[in-house]
Amino acid sequence: MGEGHGDTFEGVSTDRLKLELLEEIHMKDVVQLSTLEIRHKIAELEANLNGDLAGSEWKTRYETQLELNDQLEKQIVSLKEKMEKMRGNPSDRLSSIRVYEKMPVESLNVLLKQLEKEKRSLESQVKEYAFRLEQESKAYHRTNNERRSYIAEMTQVSGSNQVSKRQQMDPLPRMKESPVKTGRHNSMNQKTTNAKKGPVKKVPRSNHLPKLNP
């Protein structure tokens, strides 16, 4: 390591090092926020795909979110490459820092404000995506609950219709009467008829034998 002189280290001022550190922190925050957003959305999409509801609306949302995830992943890769370059060869890092050394303080302040503005913009986008995810999740659960309610109602109505049809198509079976039961039934009817007519008159029997002619 070379000797330090003044407020510099390896020919780099502490202000320049602070600016580099701020930029690295900014990139790290962006990567973490983007990764969190992707993981959260993947979990949401997996839950939607594993659910019972598979309509065209959710398919469209899924395809749209895949495109958004692809863009976020490209941004993450780009930011990681920049971070690797800055963490790689020290000479390259110093050369990139020397670029800032040649810039006036006013330009550095403008750059710093621009980085802070980009950070706030990215944070705002993440909040917006989180809000959209929450709204879509509520809409999904509401639609799913309505679907289950409709299915339960349809099942109940279908069961009532089946019971009604079964009652109309299946009349009560009639018992066939056997001949013995029929005879007994006729005998009972005859007794009932005689009872209505009154007591039956008995014919007196003669105890005398007929006389024989000699």
Curated annotation (Swiss-Prot):
Disulfide bonds: none
Chain intervals for the UniProt region annotation (Disordered): 154-214
InterPro entries hit by this protein: DUF4600
Compositional bias ranges of the Polar residues kind: 155-166, 185-195
Presence of the UniProt keyword Phosphoprotein in the record: no
Keywords per UniProt: Coiled coil
Coiled-coil spans in chain: 56-138
Family matches, as Pfam families: DUF4600
Similarity comment text for this entry: Belongs to the CCDC169 family.
Name of the protein in its database record: Coiled-coil domain-containing protein 169
Species: Mus musculus
Gene symbol of the encoding locus: Ccdc169
